[in-house]
Design a protein with these regions (language model features):
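An N-terminal assembly and electron-transfer interface module characteristic of large anaerobic redox
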Residues: 1-417
Length: 417
């Protein structure tokens, strides 16, 4: 399928759209979905001093990710690089009953306090939250975003599963960058965005990564679960991927497509209207692509959790499917999936005070390991005032504990040590 070519000139668009950094492995591709006559996207990449800036304008009781997002956006506006009169801020919102539901209002208040009350805040959601402030989107945007998500998923899995074993340092990163450039060219030109080409590219990507020369050793694998921002953004998880690899282990982060399918399953398809019918069709398409991606990974002996519906079924009786706020039952289900499929060490990270993660995650982990009879789940919080030393020590405890001791949460593991 061919869609309209992207114009990358900032002056072509009516507005400059600040997009919060949330998905390290996906935004290099998904960002192309935002280009249009209306918007020129700028994905926030500033890191220096963002926590301090964010806490000037956001109450410490709010989620840690919000302080990072606000800090990045205020610093970008203060930098003088952008025409403030053309800037708009994007804040994706799930619209659930958690602190994240207040992100849009909190961001507006922060901008007002920072002297940028004139800068509009747009929301991107499917729940009808603040319809007057909804970002405009069309079919080419959705189509590009879908391709960016699935290509980002498979490249993330391949990179994380290859880099710890590469004989020539940097080989996996170079190959990842090569494929990002290839897909980026197609995204910009609006060509090769068909399911047939995606099917072929999945296998070419797996083949290329499988050809990288590897060390013979087999490393232990740590599964990462938790809140969306903390799981997929290095700012949110304090560079946990880099830390785990430096400790001689391999990390596995479950693809974003599981969250997309979970969200459609729990929030969109249960209504009886035209939007729900469209969501069901889109969900069928996502399921088909996800199965194809997993087949490609398995063909080249790369680990993956089962396709969404099988993955959900395997967690039956262990998680409560009625917990649908935020990441909801998906958090516990990912931990179950990892342990059932041989990844018996799971690291759970979440913002401090995240009630969804405490109810559907931390409060559930001890019962999961008892019922499964194996595995260990270590849970820790990220926060502006939290200790990174404590965070990394918990992770080290998980990495270094003997596999024969595995069956319980971190408190039970400490007792055995």
């Amino acid at each position: 399928m061919r869609v309209k070519r992207i114009n990358e000139d900032m002056n072509y668009a009516d507005s400059i759209l600040f997009v919060p950094a949330m998905l390290d492995m996906h935004f290099p591709l998904i960002r192309y979905a935002f280009y249009s006559k209306d918007y020129y996207p700028v994905v926030m990449d500033e890191e220096d001093g963002i926590t301090e800036t964010g806490l000037k304008y956001i109450n410490h009781d709010m989620c840690y990710p919000l302080s990072q997002i606000v800090g990045q956006m205020v610093n970008a506006l203060n930098s003088g690089k952008y025409d403030v009169n053309r800037v708009k801020l994007l804040m994706p919102a799930a619209g659930d009953a958690c602190r994240g539901a207040n992100y849009v209002g909190a961001l507006r208040r922060a901008m007002q306090d920072a002297g940028y009350g004139c800068v509009p805040v747009l929301t991107l959601n499917v729940r009808g939250v603040e319809p007057e402030s909804m970002m405009k989107f069309d079919f080419p945007m959705v189509w590009r975003a879908m391709f960016g998500m699935f290509y980002g998923d498979i490249l993330m899995v391949l990179l994380h599963a290859t880099r710890p074993y590469e004989k020539k340092k940097g080989a996996a990163d170079r190959l990842w960058n090569k494929w990002i450039k290839i897909i980026s060219r197609d995204m910009i030109a609006g060509k090769n965005l068909s399911l047939l080409v995606m099917h072929r590219n999945f296998r070419l990507m797996c083949r290329d990564f499988a050809r990288i020369r590897r060390k013979g050793e087999r490393k232990q694998v740590i599964g990462l679960v938790g809140e969306l921002y903390v799981k997929y953004c290095h700012l949110g998880n304090w560079d946990v991927v880099d830390f785990i690899e430096k400790q001689g282990a391999e990390i596995h982060v479950n693809p974003l497509s599981y969250y997309a399918l979970y969200y459609m399953d729990t929030h969109m398809i249960r209504k009886h209207n035209l939007e729900a019918k469209g969501a069901r069709l889109l969900m069928k398409l996502f399921e088909m692509i996800q199965k194809d991606m997993i087949k490609a990974l398995e063909k080249y002996d790369y680990f993956s959790l089962p396709p969404y519906w099988q993955f959900k079924k395997e967690a039956h009786g262990l998680v409560n499917y009625n917990v649908r706020n935020g990441d909801g039952w998906l958090i516990g289900a990912e931990a179950v999936g990892y342990i059932k499929h041989g990844v018996e060490k799971v690291f759970a990270a979440q913002p401090f005070g995240c009630m969804v993660n405490h109810c559907a995650g931390r409060g559930l982990y001890p019962s999961l390991t008892r019922k499964l009879g194996k595995g260990s789940i270590v849970s820790t919080d990220v926060d502006a005032s939290a200790s990174k030393l404590n965070y990394y020590n918990r992770l080290l405890m998980l990495i270094q504990v003997d596999s024969s001791m595995l069956c319980g949460n971190e408190d039970e593991v400490k007792e055995r040590e």
